[in-house]
Amino acid sequence: MEKSKRLFIKSKRSFRRRLPPIQSGDRIDYKNMGLICRFISEQGKILSRRVNRLTLKQQRLITIAIKQARILSSLPFLNNEKQFEKSESTEKITTLRKKNRN
């Protein structure tokens, strides 16, 4: 029996605890865009609590702040970076066409 018990003992690995994403001095507010943008995906979705590693209360406050910022138009509902990239590339093409015509 002693041999079978020894098989299941795991070695203790040391691990480094990550810093919390929200420090004690950070204020969760819809005006704090630098903080809010860290918790939004590339598509503009609010990241889950497991991904953010936040407490339930912090996640609730972040969600409310993001929704307020979206309603007040300081944050887009969808992330439109790809649309801006396309518009810039089309501007380059049109300027090249105009140069070729002259």
UniProtKB/Swiss-Prot annotation:
GO terms for molecular function: small ribosomal subunit rRNA binding; structural constituent of ribosome. Its main location: plastid. Disulfide bonds: none annotated. Keywords: Chloroplast, Plastid, Ribonucleoprotein, Ribosomal protein, RNA-binding, rRNA-binding. It comes from Phaseolus vulgaris (Kidney bean). This is Small ribosomal subunit protein bS18c. The gene is rps18. Belongs to the bacterial ribosomal protein bS18 family. It is found in: Plastid, Chloroplast. Part of the 30S ribosomal subunit. SUPFAM superfamilies: Ribosomal protein S18 (SSF46911). The keyword Signal does not apply. PROSITE patterns: RIBOSOMAL_S18. GO terms for biological process: translation. Gene3D superfamilies: Ribosomal protein S18. It comes from the Eukaryota. GO terms for cellular component: chloroplast; mitochondrial small ribosomal subunit.
